[in-house]
Structures are given as structure tokens and as C-alpha cells.
């Protein structure tokens, strides 16, 4: 598998497809480059998936997990493979925001799925420390089981979601993710949201109602900030999952400029 060096960090990269457009995919907190792997073969061109520092198969420095650090990882991978499009999920969307805040013309097309942060710190970041504590205190498999137990009610309503979450946790680097959690939840994606008004690239925003970590209201705020944006808002997690085929097609057409 290809790797990209970014300072003292080695970033794991996986490639799907070939040709244009070249799109870099930035995953969410605790996940890896495999997060969107089931969907990238359906997209045209080249999909460049990578693991952020501390995640998946990339190296895990002792510190340096703020959004500007993650944006640096994103930029290094995008430049290495000539990516002019970017797709980001949650934390990955925050890394895109951080990067275009400094370089508004960095990407030609941008997709943000379930954005989670802007220029206001998370409320009660200590609530995430419990996950970091578990990852640092128990063997990986036991830590994952204990973390999944905290979502017992959610899994009772939709048991299949547990298997999905378990799959997403499998490539996790426990110590690296714990370090990332402690830093990134105390940071902001961008110093001033008004900087996003300078971004002229088309932006596709995908959000859902009822998600406290990825509030739909943030999607509406971003829709107002970006000069050329589309907003898709789903009513629930169930509707989001059911809409995946439609969303994949929507993203495919958007990235191709159709």
C-alpha cells in the first residue's frame, strides 16, 4: 500500500479506480480509510482514501491532533496524488474546513457528510474522555465491547447498527485514537466561520435531524456560509441508511460536475 510522509507522520493510503476526477476521502474520528470503502468503487475517477494520524494504519505521534494537524495530513495526501476534489465525514469535514480556511481555492468540489464542528468548541468535551480512558485501559477488543455497551438502547432499536459499528472499529489504533480524542474535541475546525464565504467551489452538504454530534443546524449554517452549496437533510438515521444508494449517486454526479 502507498504511504505519504507528512513531517514525522507516516500516512497509510489506499487507491480505488483511476483517471479523473481525483478525490481524496477524509474519514471521521475513530474510523479509518475503510470507512467509505464500500462506496468508492461506485464513483468515477480515482478515490484516494487515507488514515489520519493516530487512526487505522497510519503512525500515531504522542501529540499533534488538532484540526490544523489533520488539515496538514489531508493536504499532504491530496497533493501527493493530485486530488482536486475532497469528501469528508465528521472530523474529516472539519479538516477540509480548516484547510480551505487558509486556502479557499484548494479544492474544485467538496462534499461534507455529517459535519460536526465549526468555530465554536464542543460542549462538555470531558464526555469524550471516557472513550479515550477505555481505549487506554483495556485490550482493544474489550475496549470496543465496553464502548459499544454505551449505545445499548440504540442497538435495541436497530440491532444491525451494532454490527456496522463493530466493523468500523476493527481497524482502530487504540492509543492513537485516544490521543486524537483528547485533542480534537477541544479544538475548533476554523478560527472564524466567515472565512468560508471565500470558498467559491461547489459544496454538497449531507446532514440528518436528531444527531447531537452532527447537528443538522450546522449544515444549515454552512449552507448559508458557502457561496455555492447544496444541502441534503435526512429526517432520521433510518432514513439516512435507507437513502445510501441515492446519496452515492448524488455524490457521484456532484463530483463529476453533472
Which positions does each model-derived feature cover?
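Conserved HGGG/HGGXW glycine-rich cap/lid loop of the alpha/beta-hydrolase fold
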Residues: 6-59
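Conserved alpha/beta-hydrolase "acid-adjacent" motif
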Residues: 212-218
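Active-site loop/oxyanion-hole signature of alpha/beta-hydrolase fold enzymes
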Residues: 49-87
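Flexible "cap/lid" loop of the alpha/beta hydrolase fold
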Residues: 97-137
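Catalytic active-site module of serine/aspartate enzymes centered on a nucleophile-bearing elbow/loop
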Residues: 228-258
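Conserved alpha/beta-hydrolase catalytic His-Asp/Glu region
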Residues: 122, 137-186
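Gly/Ala-rich beta-loop-alpha elbow adjacent to hydrolase catalytic centers
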Residues: 88-96
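Short beta-strand/loop motif that positions the catalytic acidic residue
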Residues: 199, 205-207
